[in-house]
């Protein structure tokens, strides 16, 4: 018996060691199927676990007691307050699906647990509770000096910087509106910085929102946006701008366009307020983003053995659906220039705009040095006033709705929506191009960087539509799907009004988008284990009841600034344009079709591009970035472009993202203490660009991880992405699987079952030109040549379709 117990104990110890190693396996130069990447913290902290009530089951396993009534068991990453708790304060451990552990979380999305008023925290924060007129006056003078003294040097058209600025573009009117909003936020931030300096407020108090001083009784109160009055909280249709989704009056702006991002962890701003992260853990300056990019993120061709470019392209459409940031602008709405012409040098402090964070290029740079480039333009993101009208750190603006609601198709405002509608039969406006429906051409001269290319640029619900031709392809597909559905509804209900047909078609297309996202796309990205743990798997029948009025659906800085940028690694540097029988007809370098959509006017190109997306493999998500993005991004007619990898690293620092190690801790996993925990080649490269593992940028660290089982990203990105899509589901009252007790526009049971039939393959068939595309792979995100993924004819009854008879009145 003792021998058996010894063997069982040995097995437990071995399992713990393997789990800890697996969680931080670093990606090699090939795609490996790896063991389950369970975060090891609950198992590793045996002393802590022994204090929690558990009930024994059989053999080696123990089953935790359920959480108390009203308290949910969530993954550690969804209970961020645990990071700041002592071991005896940690929440009760509980069981999650797939054999995982979580916390019985009582603190929700808050970064800290409530503290008693007599705690040292409250005592230390014994500063004034109101803003004095002296502080307000001085802050106002500082702000006006900053605004009036700023250099008004714009980016010139035709340069890569100009094209990069278009990723923040919506309309000229919106750009000026966002300029005013951001200035209001900057004045509040400057007031916060001055108050903090004068009162010597600890950084910790700012980053944890422990400075309960309001702007409401000051001249800055007009910068605060009051929640809208929601006249009909039971509206069947969601609003265009995302307002009034949450039924609580003080939360009616949650998830709406123009609202700030949330954070999983407090920011790493150096002053706790808005100064970018610029120093390593030992106080020395962080190395430049371009140096890290060229050292760690080289271009290596690693085609994914299973998944295709449709994963990359659908992922970008989804990214544009849920987020669009804005860069700080000049007074006339022009883009800010931080470098001299052609990037020869960074502008002097006297000439430089306060929002400049130029990326330094070293003289020995193997690419940019050939062109004399020493500076890449980079401008900080626009801010939005804190929703609680309180002294706080800088919060980044998102211009579109935070929900998965097909906003690239419909826009994120009533005005944008009206510009897209035909106002006949519930349809969207389209351009008839010799019998093919394409998006209408735009009148916006800033939609494309080149005036010549701009003549064929398209108009949609999102200002970034023309960014790359594959994106335009899916935008056309979704617009066509709306009109197909609207036409079918009109045939079924000929007396229905244009407004009813439009809103019903929109409601159906949004549901289709959500179902494809959660049923087909997301499992590929994060793997089946995370889908189960975060309750993201769509039901086969019946309604979900996961809505939580306390969940803010806003995107997080960590998701926007790092984890979801994993898609940049999946981009191939070229499109292999394939004709009907799979023959490669043309190879197109992606920089040549950025903001240059003219090829879409070729009769067969739309079908050929769809075929390319489902046939050509995506690149593996790893530490390799295509040179099309790291050297030639938005080059236009120039011999060089920008470096997207360097931009991503710099953007994380601009947003105050914490280091990679901090997010390991948030997941409940051990921090890295040595570069030697990575494979030797990567460890050597890391040691050349970072002082310690505590300095590794989140985006970089996430790309170095080995993919989770059944997914394409590592465990850290998988957790951050899973958390985000849980927010989108739990915080969206109009999510397609909710019944009418939650969702005023709920589908009836028959309609919901029809929605569950939709697949991306069906949408490809229904909305292709059928010129060269007659069949599709049954699993549209899987390579057409992958074993078991047979091609199926578009007219084959075995390809499911949504029967819209369920919508007959």
Swiss-Prot record:
Heme b binds at residue 568. Coiled coil: none annotated. Residues 36-55 are annotated as: Disordered. Residues 22-223 form a propeptide. Disruption phenotype: Females are sterile, and maturing follicles show defects in actin filament formation, nurse cell membrane stability and border cell migration. Glycans are attached at residue 110. It catalyses: 2 a phenolic donor + H2O2 = 2 a phenolic radical donor + 2 H2O. Disulfide bonds join 230-244, 448-457, 765-794. Expressed at low levels in the germarium and early follicles. Expression becomes progressively stronger during vitellogenesis, and is highly expressed in germ cells and somatic cells. A subset of follicle cells, termed border cells (BC), exhibit a high level of expression. The record marks 464 as: Transition state stabilizer. Heterodimer. This is Chorion peroxidase.
């Amino acid at each position: 018996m003792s021998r058996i117990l010894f063997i069982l104990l040995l097995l437990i110890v071995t399992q713990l060691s393997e789990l800890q190693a697996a969680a931080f396996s670093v990606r090699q130069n090939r795609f490996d199927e790896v063991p389950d990447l369970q975060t090891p913290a609950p198992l590793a902290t045996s002393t802590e676990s022994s204090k929690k009530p558990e009930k024994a089951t059989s053999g080696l396993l123990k089953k935790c007691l359920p959480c108390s009534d009203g308290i949910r068991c969530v993954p550690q990453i969804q209970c961020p307050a645990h990071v700041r708790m002592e071991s005896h304060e940690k929440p009760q451990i509980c069981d999650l699906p797939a054999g995982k552990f979580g916390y019985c979380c009582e603190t929700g999305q808050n970064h800290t647990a409530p503290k008693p008023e007599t705690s040292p925290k409250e005592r230390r924060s014994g500063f004034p509770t109101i803003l004095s007129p002296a502080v307000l006056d001085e802050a106002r003078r500082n702000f006006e000096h900053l605004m009036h003294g700023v250099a008004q040097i714009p980016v010139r058209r035709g340069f890569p910087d100009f094209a990069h600025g278009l990723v923040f573009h919506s309309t000229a009117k919106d750009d000026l509106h966002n300029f005013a909003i951001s200035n209001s936020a900057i004045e509040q931030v400057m007031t916060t910085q001055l108050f903090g300096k004068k009162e010597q407020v600890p950084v910790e108090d700012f980053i944890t929102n422990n400075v309960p001083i309001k702007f409401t009784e000051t001249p800055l109160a007009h910068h605060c946006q009051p929640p809208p009055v929601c006249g009909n909280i039971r509206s069947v249709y969601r609003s265009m701008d995302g307002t009034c989704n949450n039924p609580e009056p003080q939360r009616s702006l949650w998830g709406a366009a123009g609202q700030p991002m949330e954070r999983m962890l407090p920011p790493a701003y150096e002053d706790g307020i808005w100064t970018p992260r610029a120093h390593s853990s030992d106080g020395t300056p962080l190395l430049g983003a371009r140096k890290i990019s060229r050292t760690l993120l080289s271009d290596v061709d690693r085609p994914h053995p299973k998944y295709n470019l449709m994963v990359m392209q659908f992922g970008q459409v989804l990214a544009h659906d849920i987020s669009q940031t804005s860069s700080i602008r000049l007074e006339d709405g022009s883009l800010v220039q931080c470098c001299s012409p052609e990037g020869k040098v960074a502008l002097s402090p006297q000439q430089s705009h306060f929002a400049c964070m130029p990326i330094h290029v070293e003289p020995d740079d193997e690419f940019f040095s050939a062109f004399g480039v020493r500076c890449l333009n980079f401008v900080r993101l626009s801010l939005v006033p804190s929703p609680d009208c309180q002294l706080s750190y800088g919060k980044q603006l998102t211009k579109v709705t935070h929900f998965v609601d097909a906003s690239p198709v419909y826009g994120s405002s009533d005005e944008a929506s009206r510009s897209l509608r035909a106002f006949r039969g519930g349809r969207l406006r389209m351009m008839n191009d010799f019998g093919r429906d394409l998006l209408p051409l735009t009148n916006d001269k800033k939609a494309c960087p080149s005036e010549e290319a701009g003549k064929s640029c398209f108009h949609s619900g999102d200002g970034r539509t023309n960014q790359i031709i594959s994106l335009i392809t899916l935008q056309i597909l979704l617009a066509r799907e709306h009109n197909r559905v609207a036409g079918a509804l009109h045939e079924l209900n000929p007396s229905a009004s244009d407004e009813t047909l439009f809103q019903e078609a929109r409601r159906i297309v949004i549901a289709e988008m959500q179902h494809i996202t959660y049923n087909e796309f997301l499992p590929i990205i994060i793997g089946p284990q995370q889908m189960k743990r975060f309750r993201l798997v769509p039901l086969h029948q019946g309604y979900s009841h996961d809505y939580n009025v306390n969940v803010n659906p806003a995107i997080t800085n960590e998701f926007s600034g790092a984890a979801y940028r994993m898609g940049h690694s999946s981009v191939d540097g070229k499109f292999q344009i394939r004709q009907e029988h799979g023959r490669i007809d043309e190879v197109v370098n992606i920089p040549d079709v950025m903001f240059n959509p003219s090829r879409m006017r070729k009769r067969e190109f739309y079908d050929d591009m769809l075929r390319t997306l489902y046939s050509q493999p995506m690149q593996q998500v790893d530490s390799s970035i295509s040179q099309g993005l790291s050297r030639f991004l938005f080059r236009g007619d120039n011999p060089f472009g920008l470096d997207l990898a360097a931009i991503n690293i710099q953007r994380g620092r601009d947003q105050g993202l914490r280091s990679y190690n901090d997010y390991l801790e948030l997941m409940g996993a051990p921090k890295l203490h040595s570069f030697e925990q990575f494979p030797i080649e990567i460890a050597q490269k890391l040691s050349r660009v970072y002082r310690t593992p505590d300095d590794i940028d989140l985006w970089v660290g996430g790309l170095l991880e080995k993919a989770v089982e059944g997914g394409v990203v590592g465990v850290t990105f998988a957790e951050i992405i899973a958390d985000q899509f849980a927010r989108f589901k739990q915080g969206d009252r109009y999510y397609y699987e909710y019944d009418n007790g939650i969702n005023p526009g709920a589908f009836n049971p028959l309609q919901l079952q029809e929605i569950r039939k939709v697949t991306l393959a069906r949408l490809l068939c229904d909305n292709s030109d059928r010129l060269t595309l007659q069949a599709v792979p049954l699993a549209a995100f899987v390579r057409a040549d992958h074993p078991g993924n047979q091609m199926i004819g578009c007219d084959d009854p075995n390809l499911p379709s949504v029967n819209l008879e369920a919508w007959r009145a």
